């Protein structure tokens, strides 16, 4: 799938309207999501792969991976309300290969082929990004 088509499809994702700023939850714009996923796809990191989406929010990156042929995706987020939006988005796209899990990234175990994420940047909460990069 080409980047522009993916971007257009991802525009259909419902936004998460109640971000918790202390968790540094920010939406990933569709242009950025499509760009990141296109690069990962071209490098062979999506199609047929098992993917973890850390801090998945509304699920835009997970859904993009599913649309690009990922085998199995697990979206993790500490915020149950964000996961409800992610579930609605996967239902909207009739995607059934994504599992949504309420969990801190510190508690994730297991193996995958590819990790995608839009982590906190530690702007409001110093070192909030550490759990995502260690």
Spell out what each predicted region is.
Residues 1-134:
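Class I S-adenosyl-L-methionine-dependent methyltransferase catalytic core
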């Amino acid at each position: 799938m080409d980047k522009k088509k993916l971007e257009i499809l991802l525009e259909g994702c419902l936004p998460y309207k109640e971000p918790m700023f202390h968790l540094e939850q920010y939406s990933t714009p569709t242009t950025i999501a499509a760009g990141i996923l296109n690069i990962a796809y071209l490098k062979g990191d999506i199609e047929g792969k098992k993917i973890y989406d850390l801090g998945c929010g509304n699920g835009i990156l997970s859904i993009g991976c599913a649309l690009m042929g990922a085998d199995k995706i697990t979206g993790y987020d500490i915020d149950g309300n964000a996961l409800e939006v992610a579930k609605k988005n996967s239902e909207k796209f009739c995607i059934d290969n994504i599992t949504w899990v309420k969990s801190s990234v510190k508690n994730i175990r297991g193996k995958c082929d590819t990790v995608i994420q839009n982590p906190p940047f530690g702007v409001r909460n110093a070192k909030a990004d550490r759990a995502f990069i260690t």
